Amino acid sequence: MDNYTVAPDDEYDVLILDDYLDNSGPDQVPAPEFLSPQQVLQFCCAVFAVGLLDNVLAVFILVKYKGLKNLGNIYFLNLALSNLCFLLPLPFWAHTAAHGESPGNGTCKVLVGLHSSGLYSEVFSNILLLVQGYRVFSQGRLASIFTTVSCGIVACILAWAMATALSLPESVFYEPRMERQKHKCAFGKPHFLPIEAPLWKYVLTSKMIILVLAFPLLVFIICCRQLRRRQSFRERQYDLHKPALVITGVFLLMWAPYNTVLFLSAFQEHLSLQDEKSSYHLDASVQVTQLVATTHCCVNPLLYLLLDRKAFMRYLRSLFPRCNDIPYQSSGGYQQAPPREGHGRPIELYSNLHQRQDII
């Protein structure tokens, strides 16, 4: 009495995941999604908001207070603008994660091009800062004589031209990834790998590692070694707090894990890592390290501002004059002791809300 019909064998297939993983190659294993769409939305919005605030504040302080009469400030301004360019695609990727609506293919290419151009311009800005810092230290006043502001502007223009040219493969050949039968331009896929051809994958991965990690690391090591040879012990202690060295060092630390995992993922066939388990863990590691690397654009301006805390607080007090009228209330009667004679300059207050004692 049962009314049913038997479907032909070729009408449907039953997919068993274990059989799929056992019988499929490493390129066919579904990539893991480390973050849910809601988490991608929160991450992109948070990084964009913090990075926008930090970099706009850095640009404002550089233009209004510090001025652009020396090369260091010009290069720091170029670095902040590069960070903003790197941040621009994040709101669009957040919208894609929230609503599932991807922008057009042309818009995706532009966003990916901006993202890559901003990253490469940051690398060149860090290198310019390192080289200029070394020249000022080694040549003294001669560096400012032979290197003018116009030369710095030309160097920044050339840096942007090179960054744009190097990002052309990402923007021209970019193809949004396929998700649920739809092409999706979203955060997560390495955007410098626009196509899946093995040769292009190797070439673009090598380009990314050389430009973002190997080249700036080499310049960083050379500059540090040359500075150490020319410095006394006291000067070395101060040198560790120079913004150019600190910012570049933190940049390399945040991008080194991503580039390392990326190298293993791209060349896994040649490193005996092509099994399903290794591929899965490599894909997950790429996503995790990409999150860490993306947040560097929020850290750079904070380091630049906080390494010179006294000047930064002075600029903030000039921006918000009412903060100067807030009386300081000591919680435990802790007061600043007067400086002793013959022991150098007194320590300046870097905040009207906090005081500390000069300990000799």
UniProtKB/Swiss-Prot annotation:
Tissues/organs with expression: Expressed in macrophages, astrocytes, in glial cells. Constitutively expressed by mast cells. Detected in bronchial epithelium in OVA-induced airway inflammation. Up-regulated during dendritic cell (DC) maturation.
InterPro entries noted in UniProt: CCR1-9-like (IPR050119), Chemokine_rcpt (IPR000355), GPCR_Rhodpsn (IPR000276), GPCR_Rhodpsn_7TM (IPR017452)
Segments on the Cytoplasmic face: 64-73, 131-141, 224-243, 308-360
Subcellular location per the Swiss-Prot or TrEMBL entry: Cell membrane
Induction info: By bacterial lipopolysaccharide in astrocytes.
Membrane topology: Multi-pass membrane protein
SUPFAM superfamilies with a match to the protein in the record: Family A G protein-coupled receptor-like
Segments crossing the lipid bilayer: 43-63, 74-94, 110-130, 142-162, 203-223, 244-264, 286-307
GO BP annotations listed: chemotaxis; inflammatory response
Disulfide pairings: 108-185
PANTHER family reported for this sequence: C-C CHEMOKINE RECEPTOR-LIKE 2, CELL ADHESION MOLECULE
Further details from the record: It was initially reported that CCRL2 responds functionally to CCL2, CCL5, CCL7, and CCL8 via intracellular calcium mobilization and transwell chemotaxis although no evidence for a direct ligand-receptor interaction was provided in this report. These results are now controversial and other studies failed to confirm CCRL2 recognition and transwell chemotaxis of these chemokines or a series of other CC- and CXC-chemokines using CCRL2-transfected cells.
Similarity comment: Belongs to the G-protein coupled receptor 1 family.
Name this protein carries in UniProt: C-C chemokine receptor-like 2
Source organism per UniProt: Mus musculus
Gene symbol of the encoding locus: Ccrl2
